[in-house]
Amino acid sequence: MQIKLILCPIDFSEFSARAYRYALSLAEHYHAKLVALHVVEIWRHPSASFSTTADLYQKFRQAFLENGGLQLQEFVKEHASPEIQRELVVQEGTAADEILSCARTHRADLIAMGTHGRRGFDRLMLGSVTDRVMRAASCPVLVVSSRSRDAAVAATERHPHRLDRILLCTDFSENSERALNYAVSVAEEYSAEITLLNVLEHAPAPAEQKSAIAAAQKQLDKLISPEQHKSLKIKTAMRVGKAYEQIVKLAEEAQSDLLVVGVHGRGALDAAIFGSTTYRVMQLGSCPVLAVPA
């Protein structure tokens, strides 16, 4: 896996600043180009929406775009990193559409976004934008919540991030295979420890539970070949209970720096590997979540 270009949408909030700092760290590590995108949704501004003439609307439009560009320049200056190649992009339109369009145009390998991390997924930093981007993006989407530990990923003084412990959640489906490969690649890149987690959410009868756990454990042990990944530090974990609760609990216990999950990317996000679990983990988890499309 190669990360040559990272796209980071910016709305100038503390949440997008957090995601941008994380993106800077990754760009520095992978020697990747970082594209900072700000989307101007002019239709949200009453002064432009109620313009009485086309000329007046164009004046408002130009002013909003110019102001967005100036704000983006100032934002990037506050998070300077001379070693990283950056590009600033200001687009007019609907946030999710422009993010996806920019990702396609620039052939982004990763999209990094921030969220409030509050209860209710509709309270994401970009509203339903993160939802739409996760479902439609062809590249992985890194979601950095306000609950994420600032020291989660610490490689440089300017961008204190490092990846020492990665947690991969799997249900053994084909959809989670790409997430596994991605997690392994990142773990090898950072010489990180990787923990493979499976949650037995619908536990069978007590008499059958032991054999079910043993069968799942056997599948976990086969996911990564120690012979093919000799330098990789591999752990496995089996849990019984509500998936999101067990994932969040283990991530905190293990002090995971990154949680990797697979998503279908089609239809409602309820079709994600863990259904609504992905949402809940993003709300409650203390580390960034990397959603990898199947």
Feature-to-residue mapping (PLM):
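Gly/Ser-rich helix-loop-strand patches that form or flank binding pockets
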Residues: Q2-K4, S25, H29, L100-A152, ...
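Small/aliphatic-rich secondary-structure junction motif
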Residues: M1-A54, H159-K210, I224, K233, ...
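Short, well-ordered secondary-structure micro-motifs
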Residues: S47-A48, L124, A154-A155, A179-L180, ...
